[in-house]
Amino acid sequence: MISNSEYHKEYMKGTTTVGLLCKDGVVLATDKRATMGNLIADKEAKKLYKIDDYIAMTIAGSVGDAQSLIRIISAEAKIHKMRTGNNMTPLSCTTLISNVLHGNRHYPLLTQLILGGYDLINGAKLFSLDPVGGINEESSFTATGSGSPTAYGVLEAEYRSDVTIDKGLLVAVKALSSAMQRDAYSGNGISLAHINKDGVKLYSDAEIEGFLKKINKKR
């Protein structure tokens, strides 16, 4: 038997996820590898989810815990829209997630989250949440998982405060690509999305391959 703290470390060590705040929206990206110890358990793991028309979220950690949380939050977002006629704002969604996580703080959900969204009044928003509900509103970029040190190196070098979504997509893909080359627990492709005034756009593998070719030409 392993302790809760040891269990937490085991499930929080893998993956790479990144989020960038752009002047016209938010970019989110993840790898696709799911690990169980030293075993690559899944090469097509879904770690990027559309929560609402203007909100998307990345997950790291225990898949079961994260998927359970996503089902709850997605349902609450739909109920909110049915009752009010409006989409839930990114801040409201983040606060709701924080409350759920904090309510389970004595036996926490083993997941670390990045939430990106677009508020038609307040613009683009980027948040990160820890397993017990702590919220950070990010003013530039963030990364989670075992590949995050490498990803942060690229983000620090490439990110600019006036970055657009078009440039942010390339930066995010470059950060993920670099992390996957150096981190054994990250790999097997990239999931990518942006959120702006028009909503959430999830990119296809072919589109992501196009971004990778652009990056490789510049190297």
Curated annotation (Swiss-Prot):
Protein name per Swiss-Prot or TrEMBL: Proteasome subunit beta
Entry-linked PROSITE patterns: PROTEASOME_BETA_1 (PS00854), PROTEASOME_BETA_2 (PS51476)
GO MF terms held by the record: threonine-type endopeptidase activity
Enzyme active site: T15 (nucleophile)
GO cellular component labels: cytoplasm; proteasome core complex, beta-subunit complex
Regulation: The formation of the proteasomal ATPase PAN-20S proteasome complex, via the docking of the C-termini of PAN into the intersubunit pockets in the alpha-rings, triggers opening of the gate for substrate entry. Interconversion between the open-gate and close-gate conformations leads to a dynamic regulation of the 20S proteasome proteolysis activity.
Keywords: Autocatalytic cleavage, Cytoplasm, Hydrolase, Protease, Proteasome, Threonine protease, Zymogen
Organism the protein comes from: Methanococcus maripaludis (strain C5 / ATCC BAA-1333)
Function text: Component of the proteasome core, a large protease complex with broad specificity involved in protein degradation.
Listed EC numbers: 3.4.25.1
Principal place of residence: cytoplasm
Reactions listed under catalytic activity: Cleavage of peptide bonds with very broad specificity
Propeptide, residue positions: 1-14
Family: Belongs to the peptidase T1B family.
Cellular localization per UniProt: Cytoplasm
GO terms, biological process: proteasomal protein catabolic process
UniProt xrefs under Gene3D superfamilies: Glutamine Phosphoribosylpyrophosphate, subunit 1, domain 1
InterPro entries the record matches: Ntn_hydrolases_N, Pept_T1A_Psome_bsu_arc, Pept_T1A_subB, Proteasome_bsu_CS, Proteasome_sua/b, Proteasome_suB-type
Assembly mode: The 20S proteasome core is composed of 14 alpha and 14 beta subunits that assemble into four stacked heptameric rings, resulting in a barrel-shaped structure. The two inner rings, each composed of seven catalytic beta subunits, are sandwiched by two outer rings, each composed of seven alpha subunits. The catalytic chamber with the active sites is on the inside of the barrel. Has a gated structure, the ends of the cylinder being occluded by the N-termini of the alpha-subunits. Is capped at one or both ends by the proteasome regulatory ATPase, PAN.
